[in-house]
Amino acid sequence: SLSCCYSASRQLAGGCLFSIRIFAEETPTMLQIGKTLVSLDVIESKFVCDLDKCKGECCVAGDSGAPLEESETIEIAAAYPLVKDMLQPEGIESVETYGTHTIDSDGDLVTPLIGGNRECAYTIFENGIATCALEKAYFQGKISFRKPVSCHLYPIRIQKLKNFDAVNYDRWDVCSAACKLGEQLKVPVYKFLKDALIRKYGPEWYNELSLAAEMYLKSKED
């Protein structure tokens, strides 16, 4: 059973009370912030994408498309006509065959893959680096949807539990260069993914995560 190492709570603007708890048995393993359980790997591990080294392999490797929230399937369907001319011919063929989204073997909503087992259908290549056509169109002002939040959050993965979201750091060997660069620059995962985490959970939640991280790291020094 988990025991509470220490706890703190703060009253935020609008009357929302966020509780922060650090759980531990012999050593801490997670932070509870509101309805999320955040792995301490997200606080302690370092990460900065190094596209010159990895070439965007996370858009290519893997046996399933990018996980999607139901609302995102609507956004992508609306965006597709505006990004179609940016896609690889094989990407267009995949979308025309499988749809703008599909369901994988686990029953989850995902983006379609080229050939059913290659890169995401929305992947494009620029100077040998795999990037996202949706994100490129977003920055060009063509669409208002940036990219699936699961992609934006990577290397964080969200697991839906009964009463909580589990916020975990997903270690993948294709990201080894990002781990090295993160260590060199001393940037933890949660700071590298600040924008994505705010997109997912909001600025107040992120501020509480930052506070909890500072509290936890200070407790390790004491």
Across the structure, where does each feature detected by a protein language model lie?
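Short loop/turn segments that flank or connect secondary-structure elements
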Residues: 29-222
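Intrinsically disordered, low-complexity, compositionally biased regions/tails
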Residues: 8, 18-20, 103, 111
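A residue-level detector for conformationally permissive "hinge/kink" positions
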Residues: 6-8, 48
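Short, Lys/Arg-enriched N-terminal segments with co-localized hydrophobic residues
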Residues: 10-11, 15-29
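Cysteine-centered motifs
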Residues: 4-5, 16
